[in-house]
């Protein structure tokens, strides 16, 4: 019996067909050597989107040819992806402390930028706004950061600067807007690099009012309280190179599993067990000089290759990484006696014994995953925000008899 992780079991044959055509990839034995038709491909795409927790295929806007250099948010998220992908042990510590227990990370690019730095009007400030409509409902925010790049200031020599961040709570027509303090960082005017401000406290408002974000406002002051134009302090905005533009990154603790829409499932035809009065021969332990075939050339329960190709699905216009991943599946015989290499449960051993006595009443034990791990997918949403999602129980790590 074949077992795939989670709801992927219905897609096994289709994915073999999709993944078998890539360079250097060999489909597992028994996979159909054909390409899917248009309708079948759409069905497979819809199923995988549901597994990934997406209601539909994202359609990001292609950037102009002149601005296709790497942008700051995707570069940062790609670093996070590699950190998360390196931590494939569900029980291990995360590769990066800032990831914490988050399994969903979203970045938001600066959509609107306002300045008050003209003439001698004070205080000076810079305001940023973001498209937060894609924030998922029902997710808990574990952290949120505003990242802005700073170059050395030639106007302030090496003075100490205080950079403060506020959330705009309510705009007023006849006075200053109502603000909520978020974070304060102290640095030197000659410093260079990414400045990170904690804006987690604003996340509750984002979750409640996705369509009414009034933005974040940044102030810079000297030690004596004099207001400084953020641009003169070396803080870059929308006019900066794409790799140095400001953005917000938010960490979520996602739901344990995506909510999948019900669909029609074709009933599987169950094969009738062959009647035999002969006891099966003992399975051989796989060793260096022999294969993993049991008696009569049948394979014992083990893990097989199953590659899911995002490239063959035509999704590389929105999936940043990876181009595909190995999901694997479990298949093979669980015949008595069950060797230690089969990772059999006590129940599987008992079921195998009863099957010997009553083969028509009790089926054999099943070959199924005994250990699953997560895989991470980095992609653009339809608003060109970059999303990093960790999907649990997507990769078979070990198989056994159940």
Curated annotation (Swiss-Prot):
The name this protein goes by in its record: Bone morphogenetic protein 8B
Organism from which the protein derives: Homo sapiens
InterPro entries found in the cross-reference section: Cystine-knot_cytokine (IPR029034), TGF-b_C (IPR001839), TGF-b_propeptide (IPR001111), TGF-beta-rel (IPR015615), TGFb_CS (IPR017948)
Keyword Magnesium: no
Principal subcellular localization: secreted
Name of the coding gene: BMP8B
GO cellular component, one term: extracellular space
Database matches in SMART domains: TGFB (SM00204)
Disulfide bonds: 301-367, 330-399, 334-401
Quaternary state and interactors: Homodimer; disulfide-linked.
Glycosylation site residues: 158, 343
Domain of life: Eukaryota
Gene Ontology MF terms in the entry: cytokine activity; growth factor activity
């Amino acid at each position: 019996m074949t077992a795939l992780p989670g709801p992927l079991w219905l897609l096994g044959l289709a994915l073999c067909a999709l993944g078998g055509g890539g360079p250097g990839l060999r489909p597992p034995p028994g996979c159909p050597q054909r390409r899917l038709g248009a309708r079948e491909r759409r069905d497979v795409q819809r199923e995988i989107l549901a597994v990934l927790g997406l209601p539909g295929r994202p359609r990001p806007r292609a950037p102009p040819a002149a601005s296709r250099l790497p942008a700051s948010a995707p570069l940062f998220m790609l670093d996070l992806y590699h950190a998360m992908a390196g931590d494939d042990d569900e029980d291990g510590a995360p590769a990066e402390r800032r990831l914490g227990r988050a399994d969903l990370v979203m970045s938001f690019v600066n959509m609107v930028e306002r300045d008050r730095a003209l003439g001698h009007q004070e205080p000076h400030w810079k305001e940023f706004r973001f498209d937060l409509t894609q924030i998922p409902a029902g997710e808990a925010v574990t952290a949120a950061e505003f990242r802005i790049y700073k170059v050395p200031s030639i106007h302030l020599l090496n003075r100490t600067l205080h950079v403060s961040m506020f959330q705009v709570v309510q705009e007023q027509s006849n006075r200053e807007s109502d603000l909520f303090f978020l974070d304060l960082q102290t640095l030197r005017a000659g410093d260079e690099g990414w400045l990170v401000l904690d804006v987690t406290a604003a996340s509750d408002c984002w979750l409640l009012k996705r369509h009414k974000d009034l933005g974040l406002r940044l102030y810079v002051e000297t030690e004596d309280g004099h207001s400084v134009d953020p641009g003169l302090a070396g803080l870059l905005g929308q006019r900066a190179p794409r790799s140095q533009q400001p953005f917000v990154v938010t960490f979520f603790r996602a739901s344990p599993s995506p909510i999948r829409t019900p669909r029609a499932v074709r009933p599987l035809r169950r094969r009738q067990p062959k009647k035999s009065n002969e006891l099966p021969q003992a399975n051989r332990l796989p060793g260096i000089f022999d294969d993993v075939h049991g008696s009569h050339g049948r394979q014992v329960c083990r893990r097989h290759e199953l590659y899911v190709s995002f490239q063959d699905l035509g999704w590389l216009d929105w999936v940043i990484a990876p181009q595909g991943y190995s999901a694997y599946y479990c298949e093979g015989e669980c015949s008595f006696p069950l060797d230690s290499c089969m990772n059999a449960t006590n129940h599987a051993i008992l079921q195998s014994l009863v099957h010997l006595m009553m083969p028509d009443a009790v089926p054999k034990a099943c070959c199924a995953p005994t250990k699953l791990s997560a895989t991470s997918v980095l992609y653009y949403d339809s608003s060109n925000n970059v999303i990093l999602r960790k999907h649990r129980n997507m990769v078979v790590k070990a198989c056994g008899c159940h």
